[in-house]
Regions:
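Terminal appendage regions of diverse proteins
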Residues: 1-160
Length: 160
């Protein structure tokens, strides 16, 4: 108990632990808020750089990203563009390649299936995944195949 008191720099160990837990909770909330703001900012950049394929808005995100943030970006874009839109993420989470596809409900009802698209492209990153017709993710082991996987997704989108 003396050692714990020294580590916490307090004679009242229980009070010091409660204070540390409260501070930790505040820091978590602050980090979550910062992540939400960053997601909004990145989503705005992705929206500004959209392309169009066969009358469909395609929003792409490449590069190193946290998987959880990519999902948040995809859904933020869907809120801004709820029809005729597809989000394609070809990202690295650490050294792990990740593919993310989100299609709007109207496209899912007309033959676009995010899960099918992701599964096909995931082969190129030596991975697998899936999800729902509107949203799917895949992870893999071959980061070198990420660019080819992105190209495959774009090829599939253009062919539907």
């Amino acid at each position: 108990m003396t050692e714990l008191s020294g580590i916490l720099n307090s004679s009242n160990v229980i009070q010091a632990i409660k204070k540390t837990i409260a501070e930790n909770g505040e820091l978590k909330k602050e980090a979550e808020n910062m992540l939400k703001e960053r997601i909004k900012a990145v989503a705005a950049q992705v929206i500004d750089n959209r392309t169009e394929v066969n009358g469909i808005n395609v929003y792409s995100l490449k590069g190193p990203r946290i998987a959880e943030a990519v999902k948040g970006i995809a859904f933020a874009i869907r809120e801004e563009s709820p029809e005729k839109s597809i989000f394609v993420g070809a990202t690295l989470n650490g050294d792990k390649p990740m593919l993310t596809v989100l299609v709007t409900d109207d496209l899912a009802q007309n033959g676009f299936n995010a899960s099918t698209i992701v599964r096909e492209a995931a082969k190129l990153i030596k991975g697998g995944g899936g999800g729902q017709p509107q949203f799917a993710q895949a992870g893999g082991k071959n980061a070198e195949g990420l660019s080819a996987a992105y190209d495959k997704i774009m090829e599939i989108i253009a062919s539907i």
